[in-house]
Amino acid sequence: MAWNYFRSYPRTDRAFPATLRLGLLEVTAFIGSEEAEKLLLRELDAPGPGVEVAYLEIALQDMAPGKHLKKILEITRELLEKLPPIPAGEFSVDRQAKGYLYSILVKYRDLVFVKTAERLLVNPDGSLDGYALSYLRRVLGADAIPILQRAIVDNRITDGVAKYAVRDAVLHYVGQSAQADKILMQTVQEGLDQQKEGREFNWGPFKVSNSALMRDFQNQPNETLLKRRQLIQNIREEFNHPTLNQGLN
């Protein structure tokens, strides 16, 4: 689901576990003994939904920081690769299983799963996995752009939200990446190509590019800000569209 790209990854609620089983895992972790650690490890060997792995990751890292992390990440990757579709009628924590698992990989900047996430990014029916997209952007940064460029031109993707999400992921790096800057200019050109003669100017196609130019403006380094300002000037000069230029002022 492409919308998941725009959402935060789900978080565990350790104060109020969503199920009795999660509550029992929490109590076991609270005991904190060697036997409790062994019990949690046995649970990790045969985990339930993604949320259980998320609870176990926190518990085991609290009890023995780093000791079981390799195993946690291996199991997380295995579950994500084989995760079946979750029916809509399931509990909320079960429907969010994929989000919980990806949140673990993002937390530890795990790069091992990158190739698999690239394969899972676009489903056979053309739908976009928003969690996979978010993972790729967060762990790779601007290095994700070549992967995302392939998604931009993937003819299987026809949904407007999915197309927007992929562009947004690339344009996070406007002013930092020459590839992102080039795609920004292409996006502006495509927006102008969509205008209808004699109709009111449609700003919709420019939302993603305008948002990229202004994103987190106050926290960017001076070099990035200067490059963004230059991009705005390039847009004015290259396309020379009165309405667009006025909107860029």
Model-identified regions with their sequence ranges:
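Buried hydrophobic core positions in alpha-solenoid tandem helical repeats
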Residues: M1, L39-L44, I72-L80, T116-E118, ...
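Repeat-mediated protein-protein interaction surfaces in helical alpha-solenoids
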Residues: A2-P10
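Structural detector for internal amphipathic alpha-helices that build alpha-solenoid repeat scaffolds
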Residues: Y9-I31, R42-D45, V53-G66, P87-D110, ...
